[in-house]
Amino acid sequence: MKIIAISGKAQHGKDTTAGFLKSALEADGYKVQVAHYADLLKYICKQFFGWNGQKDDAGRHILQYVGTDVIRTQKPDFWVDFIISMAELFPDTWDYLLIPDCRFPNEIDRIKSAGLDMVHLRVVRKNFTSPLSKEQQAHPSETALDNTTPD
């Protein structure tokens, strides 16, 4: 299985890129799964914190707070280890596993150190004004990969 980790700022087209890749790869006969690190986070926020699923200011705050400020602070590899476990448990189920919400260096490094075949792509949306607040734009989940080089 080949893993493609896609990074980029909020609303720069990570999911759109994953959708294009999925369509193209499936057209060539490959089995493709799209899995977000945040899939499990969203479940936790809905089930345990009453999040309504909206990515408005309050929604982004709860996602950043639970996902980064609490869980990543205490267990930095929590999200990536879940995805690695899925890849290791089902190695022959998909030809490609696309992860369109890579936001931290360990989410790349940990997959590589697990011996999985991975490439890191970054999506950049030029001339785009972010609708996020200055505080949200400065959050580590938006800035942690600023000085890394994709493959």
Model-derived regions: residue spans:
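Conserved lysine of the Walker
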Residues: 14
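Small-molecule kinase domains that catalyze NTP-dependent phosphoryl transfer to phosphate-bearing small molecules
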Residues: 77, 82, 121-151
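Post-Walker A helix-loop "phosphate-sensing" segment adjacent to the P-loop in P-loop NTPases
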Residues: 23-33
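P-loop (Walker A) phosphate-binding loop of NTP-binding proteins
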Residues: 9
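Hydrophobic positions on the alpha1 helix immediately C-terminal to the Walker A/P-loop
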Residues: 17, 21
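Extreme N-terminal starter segment of soluble prokaryotic enzymes
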Residues: 1-4
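Conserved phosphate-donor/acceptor-positioning beta-strand/loop module used by diverse small-molecule
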Residues: 96-103, 109-132
